[in-house]
Amino acid sequence: MLHYSVVFLVIALIAAIFGFGGIAAGAVEIAKILFFIFAIMAVVSFVMGLIKKN
């Protein structure tokens, strides 16, 4: 689960780079939303991984 969260976070970051760079001006809001969603998912997955190890 952590793997998928990190993959989607990277995809959101790439979309943000394109959006903030002016390449896809319409994708800026989507990239912002995806970034925060997947950043939260990555943190939750990391914490869940730590809990399951113990």
From Swiss-Prot:
InterPro entries: DUF1328 (IPR009760). GO terms for cellular component: plasma membrane. Its main location: membrane. It is found in: Cell membrane. Keywords: Cell membrane, Membrane, Transmembrane, Transmembrane helix. The chain crosses the membrane at residues 6-26, 30-50. It comes from the Bacteria. It is a multi-pass membrane protein. NCBIfam families: PRK13682.1-1, PRK13682.1-4. Belongs to the UPF0391 family. This is UPF0391 membrane protein Bpro_0879. It comes from Polaromonas sp. (strain JS666 / ATCC BAA-500). The lineage of its organism: Bacteria, Pseudomonadati, Pseudomonadota, Betaproteobacteria, Burkholderiales.
